[in-house]
Curated annotation (Swiss-Prot):
Ribosomal protein recorded as keyword: yes
Cellular component GO terms, alphabetical: ribonucleoprotein complex; ribosome
Keyword terms of this UniProt record: Ribonucleoprotein, Ribosomal protein
Stretch list, region Disordered: 30-58
Protein name: Small ribosomal subunit protein bS21
Alphabetized Gene3D superfamilies for the sequence: Ribosomal protein S8 (1.20.5.1150)
GO terms of molecular function: structural constituent of ribosome
Family designation: Belongs to the bacterial ribosomal protein bS21 family.
Organism: Clostridium perfringens (strain 13 / Type A)
Bias (Basic residues) ranges: 43-58
Keyword flag GTP-binding: no
Biased composition, class Basic and acidic residues, residue ranges: 31-42
GO terms (BP aspect): translation
Pfam families: Ribosomal_S21 (PF01165)
Length: 58
C-alpha cells in the first residue's frame, strides 16, 4: 500500500499529487484493473502470446 507523510508547510494538493505519483509508480491502479474480474489461466496465456506476437511484428 502506498503511504506518504504530509510534510511541514506542504499543501494538501501537493501531498495528493505526490501520493498519486507514488501509486502510479507502484502500479496500484493497473493491478486493480487487472484483478477487477477473474481471468482464467488459459485466457491469460492467450493474451500473453498475442501481446508477444504484436511486439514481434511491430
Amino acid at each position: 500500500m502506498s503511504e506518504i507523510r504530509v510534510k511541514e508547510n506542504e499543501s494538501l494538493e501537493q501531498a495528493l499529487r505526490r501520493f498519486k505519483r507514488q501509486c502510479a509508480r507502484a502500479g496500484v491502479l493497473s493491478e486493480v484493473r487487472k484483478r477487477e474480474h477473474y481471468e482464467k489461466p488459459s485466457v491469460k496465456r492467450k493474451k500473453k502470446s498475442e501481446a508477444a506476437r504484436k511486439r514481434k511484428f511491430k
